[in-house]
Swiss-Prot record:
Catalyzes the conversion of long-chain fatty acids to their active form acyl-CoA for both synthesis of cellular lipids, and degradation via beta-oxidation. ACSL3 is required for the incorporation of fatty acids into phosphatidylcholine, the major phospholipid located on the surface of VLDL (very low density lipoproteins). Has mainly an anabolic role in energy metabolism. Mediates hepatic lipogenesis. Preferentially uses myristate, laurate, arachidonate and eicosapentaenoate as substrates. Both isoforms exhibit the same level of activity. Keywords: ATP-binding, Endoplasmic reticulum, Fatty acid metabolism, Ligase, Lipid metabolism, Magnesium, Membrane, Microsome, Mitochondrion, Mitochondrion outer membrane, Nucleotide-binding, Peroxisome, Phosphoprotein, Signal-anchor, Transmembrane, Transmembrane helix. Signal peptide: none annotated. InterPro entries: AMP-binding_CS (IPR020845), AMP-dep_synth/lig_dom (IPR000873), ANL_N_sf (IPR042099). Its cofactor is Mg(2+). It is an enzyme of class 6 (ligase). This is Fatty acid CoA ligase Acsl3. The gene is Acsl3. Gene3D superfamilies: N-terminal domain of ligase-like. Residues 42-720 are cytoplasmic. The keyword Lipid metabolism applies. It comes from Rattus norvegicus. Belongs to the ATP-dependent AMP-binding enzyme family. 5 rat isozymes encoded by different genes have been described. ACSL6 corresponds to isozyme 2 (ACS2). The lineage of its organism: Eukaryota, Metazoa, Chordata, Craniata, Vertebrata.
Length: 720
C-alpha cells in the first residue's frame, strides 16, 4: 500500500561540489548580510516559525468518522462572500459599484504575425504583441448587459441552456457575466475537445445558441454543425469567418459586437430580464474526463459563491493592487473560480495563453516580450504539468552553467531551503541568485496556486525557493466547484494540500478493499468525502451517476464521494495518498498504486511524461513513456546509438537503457520491487489535450492511453 512520506529539506537538497573552506566563507557573507539588512525581521522570526505548525483544522467530534473543519469555521461553514450577494449577478454588481472605473479585463493587441520555418521544415506562427488594453468594471458591466439583452432578442430564454466553446479571453468572461445576469444556464466545453465529445455535450444540453471564436468555428465546429439539429445561432467573439456556404440551412452566424448592438437597440420594456435565484443553475460544466465521455456537472449560483468565498479567505491581502494572469481554460473549474475570486476583489485580470505566456513561449517571436514580462502579475494559477516544465527547464539551464555558477546556485538553493524550514527569509539569495528565475514569470509573483492534479514535492519546493513566493497547493473537483482545501501561504511543507476551506468540511470513509481506515495509526486514512454548500447539484441527465457519487446526510447537507484516498496530519492538513481507480491488484495479490509509481518517476530529466499500467492477469507493471528529446538523444550518443528521433524511440536497446534509469530512480524512491515497471514503450509523440490522451489539466486519460497502446501492451505482456 501507499506509505506516504513527506519530503524534508535535508532529503531534497541539490548536490554541490564546492571546497569546504570557500563554502564556510560564503555562508558567513550571506549570514552577515542577512542579519545587518533585516534585523527587524529577526525579532519577528520566532512567530513566523510558529505559524506553519499551528492547528489549521480539527474534527468536530471525537468519532473516527467525524468531519474536519477549518478552525475558522468550527461554528458554521461560510457560504456568502458579501452580505446580500447570494447570486453571481449580485456579486458582480457589488464589485462594479465598488471598483467602477478600475481596470478589470486586459488583452494584448497583435502587432504583427508571421510564419517562421523551423530547422525540421515545420512552420510555426510567431507573433509580436503590444501592451495590454484594458476594460474597466463599468465597461465590462455594460458590454455584458448589452450582450445578454441581445441574446434575449435572439430568443434565448431564462433557465435555458446556452453553450460557450471558446479559448480563454476577455469575451469569455463578458459572455459568462451576461448569462449570470439574465439567468441563462451556461454550458462550458473545453476548446480542446474532439468532435464526438462536442456533439455529445451540445445535443445532451439541447442548446440552440453557441458562443465561440472564429478559429474554433472554422477548425472544429463547422464539421459537426450538421450533427447538432437544434442549433440556430452561432456567435463569434472576434469577427466573422470568411465563408458561410457550408453551414446548414437555419443556422445563422453573428458576431458578438452585432449581438451587443442588437441589445442596445431593443426597446426599454424588452430589456427587463429574469433574475436568478441562489439555487438556479449557473453553469453546466463538462469535465474533460480522465475516464469515458465528458459528464456535465450542474453548478448553482450558491455553489460558486460558496467556493470562491472559501478560496478568497486563503489568499492574504487580496485586493486592488493584485494582477492575475489568466491563461488556463476557463472551462476548467480552477480557472473560472480563480478569475471570479479576482473579479470580486478588485484585481486586474490580464489574458494570456500557454503559447504566449513567457518570452520563450512557442508563439512569441524571438526578441519580443511574452505576456508575463509585460503584465508582471502578482497572482497566478497553474497545473502541475506547467510547473514541472518550468522546473525541468531551469534545472537544465543550471546544468549548462559553469562549475562556479552552478555551485553558487546550488549553495544558494540549499541555504534557502534550510532558512525556509526555520521560518526565515534569504534576501541576499533572492536578490542576486534567484532574481533571473523570478523574471521568467514577470518578477512580481507573490502567490502561485496549483491545482488540477497532485504536485510533486520536488517541484513545489523548487517553485517556493526560486520564485521567492509561496506555492499554494489546492485540492478540489469540478463536482465540489473546485473547492476543498488550499495550503496556507506560510506553510512550506510539501506533499500536502492544506486544510479544509471555510466553505466546506471533509471526512474520511473506510475503504476496506484498499486497506485504508479512519482508525489507522498514526493518522486516519480513507476515501475523501467533501460536504458543504460548494458541493454541486449532480450530473446533467445522469441520475444513476449522481446517486453513486453524491448523497445528503440527516441534516440535509450535501456530500461528494471523491474516489481519492486521503490522510489527515495532526495539524488538520490533508494529504492525497492514493486513488481508488488507480489501485490495481496484480496476479500474485499485491496492490500497486499507479499514481504512486508515476509520481516517483515523472520528475526525472529523461522523462517528459509517464503512464504506469498493470492488470490482474499479470504479475508485473509496464509503462508508456514520453522521453525528453534532448536527454534521450544525449543518452543515445553516450551509448553509441544513432538514428532519427522515431528510430531511437522504437529501439529496444534504448527502451532497455531508459528502463535502467527508471529502475535506479524507483529504488531511490523506495518503490517496492513489484511496483517498478519491468517493460516500457517509448513514445516519440508528446501527450497533449489535442491528442485526447490527457485532459486539459494534463491528467492522464488511462482508458484512452490503454486503447492507444493496446498493441504495445500485448507485446510487453507476451501476447501475440
Amino acid at each position: 500500500m501507499n506509505n506516504h512520506v513527506s519530503s524534508t529539506p535535508s532529503t531534497m537538497k541539490l548536490k554541490q561540489t564546492i571546497h569546504p573552506i570557500l563554502l564556510y566563507f560564503i555562508h558567513f557573507i550571506i549570514s552577515l548580510y542577512t542579519i545587518l539588512t533585516y534585523i527587524p525581521f529577526y525579532f519577528l522570526c520566532e512567530s513566523k516559525q510558529e505559524k506553519p505548525n499551528h492547528i489549521k483544522a480539527k474534527p468536530v467530534s471525537s468519532k473516527p468518522d467525524s468531519a474536519y473543519r477549518s478552525v475558522n469555521s468550527m461554528d458554521g461553514l461560510a457560504s456568502v462572500l458579501y452580505p446580500g450577494c447570494d447570486t453571481l449577478d449580485k456579486v458582480f454588481m457589488y464589485a462594479k459599484n465598488k471598483f467602477k472605473d478600475k481596470r478589470l479585463l486586459g488583452t494584448r493587441e497583435i502587432l504583427n504575425e508571421e510564419d517562421e520555418i523551423q530547422p525540421n521544415g515545420k512552420v510555426f506562427k510567431k507573433v509580436i504583441l503590444g501592451h495590454y488594453n484594458w476594460l474597466s468594471y463599468e465597461d465590462v458591466f455594460i458590454r455584458a448587459l448589452d450582450f445578454g439583452n441581445g441574446l434575449q432578442m435572439l430568443g434565448q430564454k431564462p433557465k435555458a441552456n446556452i453553450a460557450i466553446f471558446c479559448e480563454t479571453r476577455a469575451e469569455w468572461m463578458i459572455a459568462a457575466q451576461a448569462c449570470f445576469m439574465y439567468n441563462f444556464q451556461l454550458v462550458t466545453l473545453y476548446a480542446t475537445l474532439g468532435g464526438p465529445a462536442i456533439v455529445h455535450g451540445l445535443n445532451e444540453t439541447e442548446v440552440t445558441n453557441i458562443i465561440t471564436s472564429k478559429e474554433l468555428l472554422q477548425t472544429k465546429l463547422k464539421d459537426i454543425v450538421s450533427l447538432v439539429p437544434r442549433l440556430r445561432h452561432i456567435i463569434t467573439v472576434d469577427g466573422k469567418p470568411p465563408t458561410w456556404s457550408e453551414f446548414p440551412k437555419g443556422v445563422i452566424v453573428h458576431t458578438m459586437a452585432a449581438v451587443q448592438a442588437l441589445g442596445v437597440k431593443a426597446d426599454v420594456d424588452k430589456k427587463a430580464h429574469s433574475k436568478p435565484l441562489p439555487s438556479d443553475i449557473a453553469v453546466i460544466m463538462y469535465t474533460s474526463g480522465s475516464t469515458g465521455i465528458p459528464k456535465g456537472v450542474m453548478i448553482s449560483h450558491s455553489n460558486i459563491i460558496a467556493s470562491i468565498t472559501g478560496m478568497a479567505r486563503r489568499i492574504p491581502r487580496l485586493g486592488e493592487e493584485d494582477v492575475y494572469i489568466g491563461y488556463l481554460p476557463l472551462a476548467h473549474v480552477l480557472e473560472l473560480s480563480a478569475e471570479l475570486v479576482c473579479l470580486s476583489h478588485g484585481c486586474r485580470i490580464g489574458y494570456s495563453s500557454p503559447q504566449t505566456l513567457a518570452d520563450q513561449s512557442s508563439k512569441i517571436k524571438k526578441g519580443s516580450k511574452g505576456d508575463t514580462s509585460v503584465l508582471k502579475p502578482t497572482l497566478m494559477a497553474a497545473v502541475p504539468e506547467i510547473m514541472d516544465r518550468i522546473y525541468k527547464n531551469v534545472m537544465n539551464k543550471v546544468n549548462e552553467m559553469s562549475a562556479f555558477q552552478r555551485n553558487l546556485f546550488i549553495l544558494a538553493y540549499n541555504y534557502k531551503m534550510e532558512q525556509i524550514s526555520k521560518g526565515c527569509s534569504t534576501p541576499l539569495c533572492d536578490r542576486f541568485v534567484f532574481r533571473n528565475v523570478r523574471r521568467l514569470l514577470g518578477g512580481n509573483i507573490r502567490v502561485l496556486l496549483c491545482g488540477g492534479a497532485p504536485l510533486s514535492a520536488t517541484t513545489q519546493r523548487f517553485m517556493n525557493i526560486c520564485f521567492c513566493c509561496p506555492v499554494g497547493q489546492g485540492y478540489g473537483l469540478t463536482e465540489s466547484t473546485g473547492a476543498g482545501t488550499i495550503t496556507e501561504v506560510w506553510d512550506y511543507n510539501t506533499g500536502r494540500v492544506g486544510a479544509p476551506l471555510v466553505c466546506c468540511e471533509i471526512k474520511l470513509k473506510n475503504w476496506e478493499e484498499g486497506g485504508y481506515f479512519n482508525t489507522d495509526k498514526p493518522h486516519p486514512r480513507g476515501e475523501i468525502l467533501i460536504g458543504g454548500q460548494n458541493v454541486t447539484m449532480g450530473y446533467y441527465k445522469n441520475e444513476a451517476k449522481t446517486k453513486a457519487d453524491f448523497f445528503e446526510d440527516e441534516n440535509g447537507q450535501r456530500w461528494l464521494c471523491t474516489g481519492d484516498i486521503g490522510e489527515f496530519d495532526p495539524d488538520g492538513c490533508l494529504k492525497i495518498i492514493d486513488r481508488k481507480k488507480d489501485l490495481v491488484k496484480l496476479q500474485a495479490g499485491e496492490y500497486v498504486s499507479l499514481g504512486k509509481v508515476e509520481a516517483a518517476l515523472k520528475n526525472l530529466p529523461l522523462i517528459d511524461n509517464i503512464c504506469a499500467y498493470a492488470n490482474s492477469y499479470h504479475s508485473y507493471v509496464i509503462g508508456f513513456v514520453v522521453p525528453n528529446q534532448k536527454e534521450l538523444t544525449e543518452l543515445a550518443r553516450t551509448k553509441g546509438f544513432n538514428g532519427t528521433w522515431e528510430e531511437l524511440c522504437n529501439s529496444s536497446e534504448m527502451e532497455n537503457e531508459v528502463l535502467k534509469v527508471l529502475s535506479e530512480a524507483a529504488i531511490s524512491a523506495s518503490l517496492e520491487k513489484f511496483e517498478i515497471p519491468l517493460k516500457i514503450r517509448l513514445s516519440p509523440d508528446p501527450w497533449t489535450p489535442e491528442t485526447g490522451l490527457v485532459t486539459d489539466a494534463f491528467k492522464l486519460k488511462r482508458k484512452e492511453l490503454k486503447t492507444h497502446y493496446q498493441a504495445d501492451i500485448e507485446r510487453m505482456y507476451g501476447r501475440k
